[in-house]
Structure formats: structure tokens, C-alpha cells
Design a protein with these regions (language model features):
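A short, N-terminal "cap"/entry segment at the start of jelly-roll beta-barrel domains
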Residues: 1-41, 124-125
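Conserved short histidine dyad/triad with adjacent acidic residue
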Residues: 29-30, 45-60, 94
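Anionic, Ser/Thr-rich low-complexity intrinsically disordered regions
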Residues: 33, 44, 110-111
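Short histidine-centered beta-strand/loop micro-motifs
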Residues: 33, 55-60, 101-103, 123
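Short, conserved beta-strand element in jelly-roll/cupin
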Residues: 46-50, 60-77, 113
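Short acidic-glycine-tyrosine-enriched beta hairpin
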Residues: 79-95
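Ligand-binding loop in jelly-roll beta-barrel domains
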Residues: 94-120
């Protein structure tokens, strides 16, 4: 007997709910696709950093692949700070301290892909 075939999913922008991120001032997250949509391996999320947003130093148990959609903001990774803008890509390995800060007047936004499953987030400060 063959395995059931995975079904395609098209999720519209209007179907995405954004929620504030705990411990992050001025950041919102919308889950674009994950296990609940039938994606077996990865979740993709869209994060918005409002002007003045600040996300404290923290680690995640899973890697993050990110693509900057809009704006310009600062990402700290393992002790170094980078100013990123639309079109930039980032790899943040698992268990590496990182943080975000939007010092500009415009919102920033990025796509973040992570493996499905549990992710333990630990504040570093």
C-alpha cells in the first residue's frame, strides 16, 4: 500500500494572524506555513520589527535561515552586529546568541525558516 500523497497548500496573506512576540518589544510574528498546514519538515514565519523594536539577546535550539524583506535594522550574532536590509540573507546556527534592534523610522520585516518541532528559546541577559 502506498503512502498518502501530500496535498499542496496555498495560504493567503489575509489568512495569516500576527501576534506579539514575548520578551520582544515591537516585534510581531505570523506563521506562514508549518506542520498544521501539512508542511512535514520546515516552518516559515514572517517577522515584523516596528521602528524602535528591540529583541533581547537569546538562543534557539534550532537553526534559523532568514531573508530580509524590507527596512533596515541591526542583527547581532555571536558578539558581532550587522546592519541588514532588503535582499540580505542570514544563517543563525542553533545555540548561537543573537538579537535584533530597529533604530530606523521604518518597519523591518524578514522571513525565517526553521525545522519543525520543538524549539527551546533561552534569554541570554
Amino acid at each position: 500500500m502506498s503512502e498518502p500523497q501530500q496535498q499542496p497548500v496555498v495560504k493567503r496573506a489575509d489568512d495569516i494572524t500576527y501576534e506579539s512576540v514575548d520578551a520582544a518589544d515591537g516585534m510581531r510574528k505570523g506563521v506562514l506555513l508549518d506542520e498544521s498546514d501539512g508542511a512535514p519538515n520546515f516552518a516559515i514565519r514572517r517577522f515584523v520589527l516596528e521602528p524602535g523594536a528591540s529583541v533581547p539577546k537569546h538562543t534557539n535550539a534550532v537553526e534559523h535561515e532568514q531573508y530580509v524583506l524590507e527596512g533596515e535594522y541591526i542583527v547581532g550574532i555571536d558578539g558581532e552586529e550587522y546592519t541588514v536590509s532588503a535582499g540580505d540573507s542570514l544563517l543563525i546556527p542553533a545555540d548561537v546568541v543573537h538579537w535584533y534592534r530597529n533604530e530606523g523610522d521604518e518597519q523591518g520585516a524578514f522571513i525565517c525558516g526553521v525545522p519543525n518541532g520543538d524549539d527551546e528559546i533561552l534569554l541570554a541577559e
